[in-house]
């Protein structure tokens, strides 16, 4: 399951301040990306966690049976969620994230500054149907209980 939401402007502004700082703690060793500049940003955790927690709680309220089935979490029980790590990818042209696995029950991505518009990307492939264009897209591969995608 996935959820799409817009990051509020106040959080975006605070996150922008964190992202624009000079970072020194590389995150590449723990990440699958073919990206040269990946840095841990622990200062961003208290900024994004309230939004992420709110989204998770809303999702959990809407789909309690799903989460009970996949994790054993039940609405009547207390449970503690924690943001383990937060990092920023300064992704350049030709860099990419290959198919990879995220551990834990929840993962999220925030696209912060995208240097192009999707309409421009789609215009690069005039010979293709719009539904067939994959460049610039983000894909979740979510297997079922039997491992089928």
Regions found by a protein language model. Give the residues of each.
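Non-heme Fe(II)/2-oxoglutarate
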Residues: 1-80, 85-97, 134
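Catalytic core of non-heme Fe(II) oxygenases with the double-stranded beta-helix
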Residues: 84-149
């Amino acid at each position: 399951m996935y959820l799409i939401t817009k990051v509020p402007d106040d959080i975006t502004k605070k996150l922008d301040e964190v992202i624009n700082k000079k970072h020194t703690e590389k995150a590449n060793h723990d990440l699958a990306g073919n990206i040269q500049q990946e840095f841990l940003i622990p200062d961003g955790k208290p900024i994004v966690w309230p939004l992420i927690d709110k989204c998770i709680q809303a999702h959990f309220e809407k789909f309690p049976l799903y989460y009970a089935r996949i994790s054993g979490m039940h609405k009547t029980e207390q449970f503690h969620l924690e943001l383990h790590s937060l990092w920023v990818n300064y992704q350049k042209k030709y860099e990419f994230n290959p198919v990879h696995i995220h551990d834990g029950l929840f993962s999220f991505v925030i696209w912060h500054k995208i240097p192009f518009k999707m309409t421009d990307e789609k215009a690069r492939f005039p010979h293709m149907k719009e539904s067939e264009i994959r460049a610039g897209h983000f894909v979740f591969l979510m297997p079922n209980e039997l491992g089928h995608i």
